[in-house]
Amino acid sequence: MSAEIKPYRISIGDDVLDDLKSRLRNTRWPEAELVEDWSQGAPLKWIKDICRYWSEEYDWRGREARLNRFAQFTTEIDGLDIHFLHVRSPHPEAMPLIITHGWPGSVVEFHKVIEPLTDPTVHGGNAADAFHVVCPSLPGFGFSEKPKTTGWGVGRIASSWAVLMDRLGYSRYGAQGGDWGSAITTAIGAQDAEHCAGIHVTLAMSTRPNVEGQPTPEEMRALNGIQHYADWDSGYSKQQSTRPQTLGYGLTDSPSGQAAWILEKFWAWTDCDGHPENILGRDELLDNVMLYWVTATAASSARIYWESFGAERRTVHKVGVPTGVAAFPREIVTPVRRWMETNFSNIQHWSEMPKGGHFAAFEQPALFVDDVRAFFRKLR
């Protein structure tokens, strides 16, 4: 295994872009949904309009240049080439911070927070709150290599991230994550406590412990949210955790299908007042979809569910490092501090956010940055 770190730039061939436009123009559309809302899925009218825009107006070359404004690299870890952004702060005493995305996200989620985190003095902050930021693409996502063997679940990714931080010369660092990134960040806190100074998560990984008595009102809200997710929002998860390969054929072949599969979650999981374009721009949404389409990672990205909902699902991480939680009101599941304290023994920071959902850094970058700064300020 080589420890070499190689510079990387996104450069998608014209043939890939021409093929995308051809597929979009020749989409075979289904009939429209039979309801006036999103309860049967992403509405045909909107998906058709998004795909028309994608084909006729979306400027990938301009977006590609924007994505390339941050330094990117690849390095081999445990047999896989891992793609990552590494943006060092101009402030020499900055704290290293590894930030991890989930599904259906990507490193695109963090493009609005990297500059405020690395150079706070230019963004209304203090140099004492600066970070050296590392944003890896999960294995099988974006420009990271697709695993060739099974075994790439949460624990293995977490240990790989510890290797990455060591390779970059960071002997003490913080970790932050949402969605799968929260699970991986939690595993880092459990596995690499010697070097991980603390973890900050936006999706609290906890379940209700066996306690006597009736649930509190806070716990009832969480339990109702869990039930709603199980009844109405979890079909994607069941498919990806059981038959990711089957799903991959359709999504890898159809850009409209890939877009609908992803964008529906930006309706369901954002604090968007009923429509994802109320909170995120059309170009931003398509930037994220493009990192799945141009890399043909529909199946490989879905496999993290297959890997992590098997034996790993029964793994309970006991975390003793300082922990911070940012609870956004439209997160998939409302976090409950009492539940978390059964596995997280050192919760030092808990914020109830006024707005925002599952894609915290993408939706509410200022709130996200302020909370990350506030938590890690205690650990420097």
Residue map of PLM features:
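C-terminal subdomain of alpha/beta-hydrolase-fold enzymes, centered on the catalytic histidine
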Residues: Q240-R380
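Conserved hydrolase catalytic core segment
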Residues: P116, P120-H123, Y170-E219
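Conserved acidic catalytic loop of the alpha/beta-hydrolase fold
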Residues: G155-Y173
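Glycine-rich "HGGG/HGxG" loop immediately N-terminal to the catalytic nucleophile
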Residues: W60-G62, G125, L138-W152, T186, ...
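Non-catalytic accessory segments flanking enzyme active sites
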Residues: L17-S89, E93, E284, W293, ...
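The serine-hydrolase catalytic nucleophile loop
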Residues: W103-E115
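Short beta-strand element of the alpha/beta-hydrolase
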Residues: A94-G102
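Conserved alpha/beta-hydrolase
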Residues: L117-F143
